[in-house]
Amino acid sequence: MLMPRKPPKGFRKPHHPDRSGASKGGNRVVFGEFGIQALEPAYVTNRQIESARIAMTRHIKRGGKVWITIFPDQALTKKPAETRMGSGKGSPEWWVANVKPGRVLFEMSFPNEQIAREAMRRAIHKLPMKCRIVTREVGES
């Protein structure tokens, strides 16, 4: 699972990240030929990222390459069940990536476009928001 190696000394539990607005960067396909682009804001957990990656790589089998362009570096906390209110914030439970609309989540290069699109469609079903498949624009390196 993706997550930070070790929280820094004096790690403070963060506030919930802001999901409003569009993505400022990472909104173009840079590494591969195809990409999955988010259309809605969402928190994507490390398990969802891993599940989508497995769905893609199992479909393409060999001959392609997949890049994950997001990283779950935000901790979300949760208090135990049947706990009274107060007595501080809960312990970190999940690691999430704060995704804004327009962000490219995964990129892929594969010789056959049909198989690549089907692999990405399967990965989109594992993600918690609406996404679309984008291609690298002509003229980009």
Swiss-Prot record:
InterPro entries: Ribosomal_uL16, Ribosomal_uL16_bact-type, Ribosomal_uL16_CS, Ribosomal_uL16_dom, Ribosomal_uL16_sf. The keyword Cell division does not apply. CDD domains: Ribosomal_L16_L10e. Keywords: Ribonucleoprotein, Ribosomal protein, RNA-binding, rRNA-binding, tRNA-binding. GO terms for molecular function: rRNA binding; structural constituent of ribosome; tRNA binding. One of its GO terms (biological process) is translation. Residues 1-27 are annotated as: Disordered. One of its GO terms (cellular component) is cytosolic large ribosomal subunit. The keyword Lyase does not apply. Residues 1-16 have a biased composition (Basic residues). Gene3D superfamilies: Ribosomal protein L10e/L16 (3.90.1170.10). SUPFAM superfamilies: Ribosomal protein L16p/L10e. Binds 23S rRNA and is also seen to make contacts with the A and possibly P site tRNAs. Part of the 50S ribosomal subunit. Belongs to the universal ribosomal protein uL16 family. NCBIfam families: rplP_bact (TIGR01164). This is Large ribosomal subunit protein uL16. It comes from Salinispora tropica (strain ATCC BAA-916 / DSM 44818 / JCM 13857 / NBRC 105044 / CNB-440). The lineage of its organism: Bacteria, Bacillati, Actinomycetota, Actinomycetes, Micromonosporales.
